């Protein structure tokens, strides 16, 4: 007898262990109430067998664990479970009478089930139970998945990646994993007052917690500890309040249809096989119509990319009062400029470019935006990287447009994507871009009138590696690799590569029409390429695109990390053969000058040694501000004058106001710089970056100033997106979800219950404000403490610091800063001086300064 009972006990334990705890929990909480109706046909035979054994085992125990009391469970939940138990027992009565009898015997005789109980779950809230089990059957589907798992394991074990070793801290987008045992019992009312003196409800606290967590990028563990702290402060009556991740996601997550996942063929990479949102995910086997390959699609498949609804994000911008005001101010300013055409053709913004005027050369006014994509590693040591598809709105002020970068898609992969994958990645964006161009979105203007606003892409801001992939052309290291002209390139044996020297006859410029002609030639003749064009591209379908000149000049990678770095290496590298090579003593003298500079606060990064790996902003500051003073009298005059041409080109094209005469001068300077570059440094130095400097002015004419079409804001946004990752699991999904959550709070698209909550959440997403300030007129703000001083027989207030037109000035008496200097000024007369005092006299701001005459000599040099 004892042997048989122990044998039964062991078999029961085997059945109990065969079913994951998550499945048991969901079964008990009512998620599988209609299992036989909805799910049985969708299960694999392995999962179905486990489930039948588990349900039979649960009927025998009547859902009463030996170590727990039946009365401790929620009444409605127990009632519901017993109903399911009775129904399932009836189904198996013929085959398992003993189980049914045991179940009836154990069940409490006083209990009478309520057959009219309402179901607290809808069908669309139920997740399929076979995801985790069927995925386990396919763990060895591909080596790419194994590599991904290895990277994730290494990431979770490595402290260098910034993650704690506690797995509870990792974020998870698993919908079911976030449902706790009592999520569905409605154990508390969100409108219950939690803090009486401030009249804050539980709903308010949840909003504050979510806003705080998003702003300061708390992990799941950090947010949970914050919740525990708040409950501790609230008092013992709120100890059992369950503010779980599931409840927060239900309230603050974006709608499920705004983030979709697109699975493509893993063999040919030429067709999207399946597109679905995460909530409605099912395992499928899809056959590719291009290569007839069967692709198994599971939750662990890596051959997919994510799309985020752009229309949804644009509507959020218009729902923000502050951003809406900026948008309509921009529209009005563009309308005024179009009515008052300036004969001097001054370039101020994108609305002065040729492509913008071509787009808006109709009755409809289109708001434009820039597009960019670039790769970055997801982790410090892993192989996987991600390519975000980002959008920069051009219809707000220049300061705001760089802060409102929108996210349209994410592609994750272990190597650089091919042109075929890039076409698929852009295909979903192209469909939405067409709808925004043709139909637009319905918004309200400042008068609260309903209007239709339409959008059109203007410029594509990508580097020289991504550009040919999107255009489906040869790269810069091949023949006909130039993006904007038909320079064939020539092979230079000394460097074993393609170079682009000046030619006797200038190469023909590319155009949209000539590119289409090359595509047609390749298609009809089955050639590998025609003048660098390898075939068709999906981007041709984007409205109003110029497949050549819509791709703007990228000065970050071309000039800052390209030409400038190449020149500096020729001057300072020990292996350099240049005639302008510097001695070690000269290099040290340049370093000494550089590190002794105390810049203004407009320059956010202090000078660093050129031996270190500099950021793009630091190289930009070096070229525009530091280089000429540091190189003077050290670098040969011929090389310095040649280098100063590059400085003048970059300075002019980054101005906020550029005249046509200045553009013509830049064209001449660029031609002169490239020509002498070949003379001074040889044909082997005529790289692609040097060659395309000849096209920079034409690119500015087509798409607008360099400052608006650079990749700087997109590179900065990539860094911000990486900060949204709090764990190694499903990192792309974390980025997409948290980006939309962050945009909700930034634009005020949150259902606030009071102004107190709204003001707090709005304030934490703003930059730090001045604590002590005093306005003097419209343009001057005095900051900090002041003291009285008698000047010309009258007492005046004297300050040490002020802000004029957004620029910080301080006197020599301001001693808090050591490595920056904002005391120097230049008058309109050309004189230089140093500020002694900043005086407020009868609502006027007066600067008492000391004239510095020795600056005149340096200016003449």
Which stretches of residues belong to each language-model region?
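Polybasic, low-complexity terminal segments and linkers that are predominantly intrinsically disordered
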Residues: 1-194
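Terminal interaction-prone segments of large eukaryotic proteins
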Residues: 3-10, 86, 112-114, 127-130, ...
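N-terminal alpha-helical interaction blocks
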Residues: 121, 159, 166-262
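Short, conserved catalytic/metal-binding motifs centered on acidic residues
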Residues: 226, 374, 429, 460-461, ...
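Structured nucleic-acid-interacting core domains from mobile-element enzymes and related host factors
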Residues: 254-267, 303-385, 451
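Cys/His-enriched microdomains
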Residues: 260-266, 286-289, 480
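Domain-level detector for long, ordered catalytic/regulatory cores in large eukaryotic signaling
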Residues: 274, 278-284, 291-335, 434-616
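Acidic, metal-ligating active-site segments
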Residues: 346-362, 366-415, 487, 629, ...
């Amino acid at each position: 007898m004892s042997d048989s009972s122990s044998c039964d006990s062991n078999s029961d334990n085997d059945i109990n262990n065969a079913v994951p705890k998550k499945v048991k929990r969901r079964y008990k909480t009512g998620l599988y109430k209609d299992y036989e109706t909805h799910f049985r046909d969708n299960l694999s035979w392995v999962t179905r067998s486990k489930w039948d054994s588990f349900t039979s085992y649960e009927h025998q125990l009547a859902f009463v664990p030996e170590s727990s009391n039946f009365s401790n469970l929620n009444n409605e939940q127990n009632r519901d479970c017993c109903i399911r138990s009775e129904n399932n027992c009836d189904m198996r009565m013929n085959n398992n009478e003993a189980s049914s009898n045991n179940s009836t015997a154990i069940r409490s005789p006083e209990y009478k089930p309520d057959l009219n109980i309402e179901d607290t779950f809808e069908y669309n809230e139920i997740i399929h139970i076979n995801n985790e089990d069927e995925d386990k059957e396919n763990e060895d589907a591909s080596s790419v998945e194994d590599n991904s798992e290895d990277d994730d394991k290494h990431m979770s074990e490595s402290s260098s990646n910034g993650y704690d070793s506690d797995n509870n801290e990792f974020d998870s987008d698993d919908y079911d994993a976030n449902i706790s045992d009592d999520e569905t019992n409605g154990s508390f009312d969100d409108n219950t007052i939690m803090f009486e003196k401030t009249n804050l409800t539980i709903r308010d606290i949840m909003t504050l917690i979510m806003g705080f967590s998003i702003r300061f990028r708390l992990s799941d563990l950090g947010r949970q500890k914050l919740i525990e702290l708040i409950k501790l402060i609230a008092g013992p009556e709120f100890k059992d309040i369950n503010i779980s991740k599931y409840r927060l996601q239900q309230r603050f997550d974006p709608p499920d249809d705004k983030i979709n996942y697109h699975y493509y063929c893993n063999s040919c990479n030429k067709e999207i096989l399946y597109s679905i949102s995460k909530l409605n995910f099912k395992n499928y086997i899809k056959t590719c119509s291009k290569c007839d390959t069967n692709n198994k699609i599971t939750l662990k498949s890596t051959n997919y990319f994510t799309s985020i609804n752009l229309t949804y994000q644009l509507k959020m911008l218009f729902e923000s009062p502050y951003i809406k005001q900026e948008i309509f101010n921009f529209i009005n300013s563009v309308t005024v400029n179009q009515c008052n055409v300036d004969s001097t053709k001054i370039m101020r913004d994108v609305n002065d470019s040729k492509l913008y005027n071509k787009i808006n050369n109709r009755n409809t006014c289109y708001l434009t935006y820039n597009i960019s994509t670039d790769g970055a590693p997801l982790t410090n040591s892993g192989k996987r990287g991600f390519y975000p598809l980002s959008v920069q709105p051009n219809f707000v002020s220049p300061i705001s447009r760089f802060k409102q970068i929108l996210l349209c898609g994410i592609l994750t992969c272990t190597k650089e994507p091919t042109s075929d994958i890039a076409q698929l990645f852009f295909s979903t964006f192209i469909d939405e871009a067409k709808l925004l161009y043709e139909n637009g979105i319905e918004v309200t203007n400042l008068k609260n009138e309903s209007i239709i606003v339409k959008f059109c892409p203007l410029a594509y801001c990508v580097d020289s590696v991504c550009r040919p992939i999107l255009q489906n052309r040869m790269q810069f290291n091949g023949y006909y690799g130039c993006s904007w002209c038909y320079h064939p390139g020539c092979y230079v044996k000394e460097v074993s590569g393609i170079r682009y020297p000046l030619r006797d006859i200038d190469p023909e410029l590319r155009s949209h029409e000539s590119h289409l002609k090359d595509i047609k030639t390749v298609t009809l003749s089955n050639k590998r390429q025609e003048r660098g064009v390898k075939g068709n591209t999906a981007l041709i379908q984007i409205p109003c695109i110029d497949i050549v000149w819509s791709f703007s000049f990228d000065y970050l990678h071309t000039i800052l990390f390209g030409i400038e770095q190449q020149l500096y290496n020729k001057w300072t590298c020990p292996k350099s053969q240049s005639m302008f090579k510097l001695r070690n003593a000269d290099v040290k003298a340049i370093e000494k000058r550089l590190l002794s500079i105390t810049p203004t606060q407009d320059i956010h990064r202090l000078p660093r040694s050129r031996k270190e790996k500099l950021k793009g902003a630091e190289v930009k500051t070096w070229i525009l501000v530091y280089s000429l003073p540091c190189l003077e009298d050290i670098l040969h005059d011929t090389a310095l004058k040649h280098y100063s041409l590059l400085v003048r080109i970059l300075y002019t094209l980054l101005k906020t106001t550029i005249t046509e005469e200045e553009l013509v001068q830049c064209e001449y300077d660029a031609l002169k710089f490239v020509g002498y570059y070949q003379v001074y440094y040889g044909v082997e130095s005529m790289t692609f970056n040097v060659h395309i400097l000849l096209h920079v002015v034409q690119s500015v004419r087509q798409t607008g100033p360099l400052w608006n079409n650079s990749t700087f804001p997109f590179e900065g946004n990539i860094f911000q997106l990486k900060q949204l990752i709090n764990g190694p699991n499903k990192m792309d999904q974390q980025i997409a979800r948290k980006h939309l959550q962050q945009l909700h709070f930034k634009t005020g698209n949150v259902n606030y219950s009071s102004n107190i909550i709204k003001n707090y959440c709005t304030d934490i997403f703003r930059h730090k404000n001045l604590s002590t300030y005093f306005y003097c007129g419209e343009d001057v703000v005095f900051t900090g403490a002041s003291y009285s001083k008698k000047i010309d027989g009258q007492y005046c207030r004297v300050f040490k610091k002020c802000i004029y037109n957004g620029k910080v000035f301080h006197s020599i008496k301001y001693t808090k800063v050591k490595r920056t200097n904002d005391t120097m000024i230049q008058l309109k007369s050309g004189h230089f001086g140093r500020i002694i005092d900043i005086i407020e006299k009868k609502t006027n701001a007066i600067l008492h300064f000391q004239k510095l005459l020795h600056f005149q000599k340096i200016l003449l040099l």
